[in-house]
Amino acid sequence: MQQEIELLGDERFESQNRETASERPAHSQSDEDLLDGYSRTVITAAEKVSPSVVYIEVEQPIRSRRPDAARTPPERRGSGSGFIFTPDGFILTNSHVVHGARKIEVTLSDGHKCQTDLIGDDPDTDLAVIRINAPNLVPAQLGDAQRIRVGQLVIAIGNPYGFQYSVTAGVVSALGRSLRAQSGRLMDAVIQTDAALNPGNSGGPLVNSRGEVIGVNTAMILPAQGICFATSIDTAKFVASRLIRDGKVSRSYIGLAGQNVPLPRRIVRYYDLAVASGIFVVSFEANSPARKSGLREGDIIIGFDDHPTAGIDDLHKLLTEERIGRQSSLAVIRGTDKLTIDVTPEESENRDHK
C-alpha cells in the first residue's frame, strides 16, 4: 500500500511540474503504462481460471443435545468456493466447507447447477475433493509450488459472502508458514498472501500471473488486515491423489495424549540432547501401540526413529503413512534415565490422540 501511495504522489508531482512526454527518457514507462500492464496481467489470469471456479452451497444438519429435539434435525446452510482440476469433474475445495454436509450443490461459471458427490476430505490439511458429472468442463492448470517466490503477483478468485466470482490481487507475503488445522494438526508449507480473502473464498484458487493454480485459499486472520493463507498446490496434489484413490489420507498413530514440556537443564546437558523440550505422556488410548509398547504415563518423548521431537507437532510430522505397521523407536526420558522403546504405529482413524 505504501508503494501505491508513493506512485500516486509521484504522479501528482510530475503533473504539477508539467513534465511532457518528450522530456521523459525514451526507455522509461509512465505510471499509467505500468498500471495498465498490471491490470492486463490480472485480467488475463482471472479470465483464464474463472471458467474452472465453482460456487459451492452445502446443507449440514445441526446436532442438538436436547432429548425433545425433533427427529429431523434443523439444517445449517453454508457456502464456499472450489475449482475443477480434471476434465472428468473432480473439484478441489476446503474440508471445512463440505465436511459433514448432507447435501452439496455446485454452481458452474455459466450458472449451471450440479449435484455433487463427496469423494473424500482431509481435515488435517483442510482439503477435500468432490465430483460433478457435467459436459465440457474446463479444468484449471495447476502450477508448481517450488517456483513460487516471495513478492510475486497472485490473484485469488472465489465467492465471498455469496458474491460469485470475485477477484482480488496481491503478492506472496511469505512462504513456508505453518497453520493449525481444525483437526489440531499443524499444516506446513502454507503460503501467506495479502490478496484479500473473505468468508466464501475458502477453497477457491490462488493463481499466479499465468493463471496457474499455486494454492488453495483456506484461511484469514481476524481482525488483522492483509494476512491470508493458502495451502500449497503441491500439498493439494498429493492429498487429492490419495482422496481420489482411497477416499482418505492414511496416517499412522501410536495412541497417546501428551503435552509439550521443557526438559530439566541438567538432563539436556548430561545426555547432550538435541532438544530442550519433549512430549510429556499424559494418557493412552486403550489397546493402542503406545500402550502395548511399554511406554508409561509421565515419560517424556524426545525422539522418534532418530528424529528429535521437541513437541507434539514434530511427532505428528513423523507419523506418516509409510510408518504404518513398521517397527519404530521412541527416545524417552524416564526420571533421569534415557531409554529406547520400540513401537509399531497403526493406521489412524482420525483419532484425537497422537
Listing of model-derived features with the role each one plays in the protein:
Residues 113, 327, 338-340:
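A structural signal for beta-strand boundary/capping segments at domain termini and interdomain linkers
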Residues 91-92, 290-312:
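Conserved PDZ fold ligand-binding element
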Residues 342-344:
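C-terminal tail/sorting-segment detector
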